[in-house]
Amino acid sequence: MFVAWRDLRFARGRFVLIGSVVALITLLVGFLAGLTGGLASQNVSAVLDLPGDRLVLQQPSTGQPSFGDSTIGQRAVDGWQAAPGVDDVVPVGIVQGRATAPGAGSGAAGSGAAASGAAVGVALVGLPTGARSTPVTDLAPGRDDQVGLSSGAAADLGVQVGDRITVTGTDYRVAVVGGDAWYSHTPVLAMTPEAWAAADRRLGGDGAPTVLAVSGSPDWDAVGASTGTSAASPLASLTALETFRSEIGSLGLMIVMLFGVSALVVGAFFTVWTMQRAGDVAVLKALGASTGSLVRDALGQALVVLVLGIGVGMLAVVGLGALAGGALPFLLSPVTTVVPAAAMAVLGLAGAAVALRTVTSADPLTALGSNR
């Protein structure tokens, strides 16, 4: 990489420009990936934490299963509980509702909505006690007149353990305040199955569970067909959330398009770059340099620029993401930082490799202008 290092030292302005563009694209891709991850977490974290190997939803006569329309009758519950190979069946009810905190404790840090007595949107989740411990099942209260709140619900309502809140016209005492749990962008409020069924009926439902969290190794398809239900892994079940499908579909398409734009932009920069170095490359080839060594030299130079630009961009993503985490649903994890950075590096090198073809395949004498 003798020529590459000399070029990097003596053409600093060019490489600062290219590196800045790479850093800005990385910042855009990384920040969008973090925002997508944060929005996804606020959409589906409660579903992913349900205590089952697979989640069972009602199979409609037409179309795909949906959390919003699913109701599991007692016959289906009994069918899954009696199926060979089933270890545990946990009926879970999920419905959107609203809660108010008319008597928030003085020690709680109430939000503006809670302080004014306004209703707060929550996801009412009916959970039995004794299920396998997860962040969601740990919220389950022990009595029908109690509720468990996720940290987000407690913060929005401005309450703590021992305070009373009103849900669908009925008062409950807060028995548990747990970790972060979300369903369809609303914080989770856990109730006993009996209390949830009563709340669901007050909201116009029939009180039947929404989903079954099933553990074991039965014949999933056969049991599903006999009970009119559909079983899928928790991750695959996310497609049954309409908000998740539309949200992730649009944001994912934007990320893919940004990756494509990054490859084109980096490739265009390196195309102009290699055209400007055509004379140097031709001299090296005329002196006996192999095509492989020239490719390694150019790609090594591109890799240095990409690593520096991506590194600066990722540092900005981590810093801004940490600052924005309190105001935006932003997720900092290897999936939203390392994966986009690696993809940017691969796509950038691919663009640089395509840009090298016209020079590395040219005849040295022609590149030197011998035809003149």
Per-range role (PLM):
Residues 92-95, 100-128, 135-198:
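Hydrophobic secondary-structure segments that place a key small or acidic residue at a functional site
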